[in-house]
C-alpha cells in the first residue's frame, strides 16, 4: 500500500467516507488509582466501519455463517 502525501485539506465528509471505507479500531485502557487503590478501570474496544467493509473482513477471516448450514 503506497502512502500519498497531499497538501489539499479534506472536508469532514471526505474524512468520514474514508473512515467508513477503511475502518478504524479504537483500543483504550484507562485506570484511575489513588494511593495504590484502583478506583475505576475502563477498557474500550470499538470498531467503526461500514457494513460493506465489515462483511468483506468477516468473510476474509471466516466469521460469516453459511445460511444453508443453519
Curated annotation (Swiss-Prot):
Q: Which species is listed as the source?
A: Cereibacter sphaeroides (strain ATCC 17023 / DSM 158 / JCM 6121 / CCUG 31486 / LMG 2827 / NBRC 12203 / NCIMB 8253 / ATH 2.4.1.)
Keyword entries, A-Z: Gas vesicle
GO terms, molecular function? structural molecule activity
**InterPro entries from the UniProt entry:** Gas-vesicle_GvpA-like (IPR000638), Gas_vesicle_GvpA (IPR047870), GvpA (IPR050530), GvpA-like_CS (IPR018493)
GO CC terms for this protein? gas vesicle shell; vesicle membrane
Which PROSITE patterns does the record cross-reference, listed alphabetically?
GAS_VESICLE_A_1 (PS00234), GAS_VESICLE_A_2 (PS00669)
- Quaternary structure note: The gas vesicle shell is 2 nm thick and consists of a single layer of this protein. It forms helical ribs nearly perpendicular to the long axis of the vesicle.
Indicate what this protein is called per its UniProt record.
Answer: Gas vesicle protein A
Q: Where in the cell is it found?
A: Gas vesicle shell
Q: What does this protein do?
A: Gas vesicles are hollow, gas filled proteinaceous nanostructures found in some microorganisms. During planktonic growth they allow positioning of the organism at a favorable depth for light or nutrient acquisition. GvpA forms the protein shell.
Q: Which family does it belong to?
A: Belongs to the gas vesicle GvpA family.
